């Protein structure tokens, strides 16, 4: 039975680090984590004990105190680790049923959404001790061996690069697009590299798109070009040198809540949000939940034909949570199962559904408060109303008080999102 005792630095709710004494014991049937002599965490089967070799520092680590998960915790999730034979592994951080190799009837794991499994724990972010300590517990089917010709310095970037590549694929650049990466530093440079890789694939089929890095530090301009940007432009903190709609799509990698308004102004068609900073922005309080669930905000369609394009389900009649006081249009009930009521009550209804994901496929909102409620119906609970990678359709409102929602309803902007 593996049994290790070690000291590690916990990150605390006071935004400081404090030493703690840990013990991990268990085997393939399950592990117990002890902290300062007290039982801290009980884990079922599907984990393996690894020794941390290196760990990157992510903006999520820097914003950890804003996230809705308990502290203290040993943080760090960009991990390179060793097994008992000294073999190197990188780790996909979401400990879902799928990642733990468990035969389970979880509808999320069965639907190709294991990174959104509600029962998952997340390495270095939610419960599981992370790579800033000497030992960690990783899901058995999420440990990827590192080839011998890949150095440690590159291997430790695999997890954040996977997140960057996921963003590039979620964005789905179109031929001829002019894309901007706003605020590239750690993650943003990897997003540029991922876009360059996607563009290389597209060029083989005769398609192309442009990538511009928007930086505040001139020293980052050359680095951005090295990572694959066609051009790098030095801008002020609001990119005031650039006109509205200067780019087809803007990827916000800043980790700064104030930058979203800049991205909204610069984007003609779409903003892709890649920041989980845990703070309010553009009048919305639940943007981190939106990114965690990889949701999309889009304009409510004017007719039935536009509605079909908004659906993310194969169901002929998707479940739709209608939150505005005004009645839905007459054409909608024929195309969706329209649920009306308070958001927390609707969330309870869809959770009891015997078929498909226990979530609404879409929601309709007419205010920032309704968008927040669609993301997290109960602010003290992480249970969402809308399914992962679902869509919240925004109706026009004269009192939205949100530049983001105004842009969605007045010029058909979309906000998409992704995480690791």
What annotation goes with each model-predicted range?
Residues 257-319, 324-351, 368-420:
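Glycine-rich phosphate-binding loop and adjacent beta-alpha segment
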Residues 49, 80, 90-92, 180, ...:
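Hydrophobic beta-strand signal
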Residues 150-237, 311-351:
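Mid-domain Rossmann-like dinucleotide-binding core that forms the NAD(H)/NADP(H) cofactor-binding site
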Residues 33, 95-182, 196:
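NAD(P)H dinucleotide-binding glycine-rich loop of Rossmann-like/cofactor-binding domains
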Residues 241-250, 353-363:
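A short acidic, Gly/Pro-enriched loop at the edge of an enzyme's catalytic core
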Residues 60-65:
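Cytochrome P450 core scaffold surrounding the K-helix E-X-X-R motif
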């Amino acid at each position: 039975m593996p049994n290790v005792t070690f000291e590690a630095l916990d990150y605390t709710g006071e935004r400081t680090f404090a030493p703690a004494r840990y013990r991990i014991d268990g085997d393939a049937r399950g592990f117990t984590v002890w902290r300062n002599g007290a039982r801290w965490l009980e884990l079922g089967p599907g984990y393996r004990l690894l020794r941390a070799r290196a760990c990157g520092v992510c903006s999520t680590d820097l914003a950890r105190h804003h996230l809705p998960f308990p502290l203290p915790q040993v943080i760090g999730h960009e991990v390179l680790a060793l097994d008992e034979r000294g073999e190197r592994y990188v780790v996909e951080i979401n400990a879902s049923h799928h990642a733990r190799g468990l035969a389970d009837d979880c509808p999320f794991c069965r639907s190709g959404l294991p990174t959104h499994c509600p029962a998952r724990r997340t390495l270095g972010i939610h419960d599981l001790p992370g790579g800033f300590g000497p030992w960690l517990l990783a899901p058995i089917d999420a440990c990827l061996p590192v080839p011998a010709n890949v150095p440690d310095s590159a291997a430790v970037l695999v997890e954040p690069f996977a997140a960057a590549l996921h963003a590039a694929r979620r964005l789905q650049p179109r031929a001829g697009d002019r894309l901007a990466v706003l605020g590239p530093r750690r993650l943003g440079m990897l997003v540029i590299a991922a876009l360059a890789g996607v563009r290389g694939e597209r060029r083989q089929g005769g398609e192309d798109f442009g990538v511009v890095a928007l930086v505040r530090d001139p020293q980052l301009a050359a680095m951005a070009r090295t990572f694959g940007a066609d051009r790098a432009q030095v801008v002020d903190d609001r990119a005031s040198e650039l006109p509205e709609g200067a780019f087809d799509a803007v990827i916000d990698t800043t980790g700064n809540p104030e930058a979203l308004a800049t991205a909204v102004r610069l984007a003609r068609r779409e903003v892709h949000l890649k920041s989980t900073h845990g703070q309010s922005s553009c009048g919305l309080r639940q943007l981190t939940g939106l990114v965690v669930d990889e949701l999309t905000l889009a304009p409510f369609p004017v007719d039935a034909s536009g509605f079909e394009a908004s659906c993310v389900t194969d169901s002929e009649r998707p479940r739709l949570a209608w939150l505005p006081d005004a009645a839905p249009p007459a054409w909608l009930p024929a195309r969706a199962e329209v649920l009306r009521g308070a958001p927390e009550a609707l969330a309870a209804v869809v959770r009891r559904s015997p078929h498909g994901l226990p979530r609404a496929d879409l929601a309709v909102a007419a205010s920032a408060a309704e968008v927040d409620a669609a993301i997290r119906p109960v602010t003290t609970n992480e249970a969402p109303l809308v399914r992962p990678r679902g869509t919240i359709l925004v109706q026009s409102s004269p009192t939205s008080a949100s530049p983001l929602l105004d842009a969605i309803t007045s010029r058909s902007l979309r906000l998409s999102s992704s995480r690791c």
